[in-house]
């Protein structure tokens, strides 16, 4: 009887993540209820975020991309802002990997992490979030947490049209009062996050 009770508690306490590419939103769920909803920027066309059922494979607070970043010259000026690691680097220059803080890998090289949200899908396949949301997701998930990615990535014009709509697929009234804290309510529009002080891809 005790084992059954523990199993029920475990199921009820299960944390999961849903990523809606159409709405450009990520949802943190506990017991099937949304406890936190974050705007995102997923993979752009040519680098679309793959849909499917995954699990968190790795967590790393100070992760850097091994494939993407920028190239600077000997004076530190940016030569290529959106560079691949195998691009030619000018003499005296260097390749600087893109920072991906609070990284939660869930599919190959793709994961959720803190990053710049320009207001439309813009990444190389990862799911960017405003930093305060990435921290909350990072602290709530574990290796093995289910991640479901669904929906169709909108074109830029269509997405910007949707951003004026009050419709969201999920009810975003927070079931967990901790996430109703004003610290998780950014002082900017829900679809846009300003660039942080550090450079982001």
Regions found by a protein language model. Name each.
Residues 1-6:
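Bacterial N-terminal signal peptides
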Residues 8-84, 89-93, 101:
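Cell wall/extracellular polymer interaction/catalysis modules
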């Amino acid at each position: 009887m005790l084992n059954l009770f523990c199993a029920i508690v475990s199921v009820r306490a299960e944390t999961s993540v849903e990523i809606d590419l159409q709405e450009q939103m990520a949802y943190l769920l506990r017991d099937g209820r949304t406890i936190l909803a974050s705007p995102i920027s997923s993979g752009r066309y040519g680098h679309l975020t793959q849909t499917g059922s995954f699990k968190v494979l790795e967590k790393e607070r100070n992760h850097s991309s091994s494939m993407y970043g920028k190239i600077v010259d000997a004076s530190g000026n940016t030569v290529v802002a959106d560079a691949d690691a195998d691009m030619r680097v000018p003499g005296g220059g260097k390749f600087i990997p893109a920072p991906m803080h609070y990284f939660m890998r869930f599919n190959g090289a793709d994961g959720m992490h803190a990053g710049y949200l320009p207001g439309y899908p813009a990444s190389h396949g990862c799911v960017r979030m405003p930093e305060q949301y990435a921290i909350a997701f990072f602290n709530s998930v574990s290796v093995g947490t289910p991640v479901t990615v669904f929906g169709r990535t909108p074109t830029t014009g269509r997405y910007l049209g949707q951003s004026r709509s009050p419709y969201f697929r999920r009810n975003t009234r927070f079931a967990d009062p901790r996430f109703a804290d004003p610290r998780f309510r950014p002082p900017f529009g829900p679809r846009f996050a300003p660039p942080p002080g550090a450079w982001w891809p």
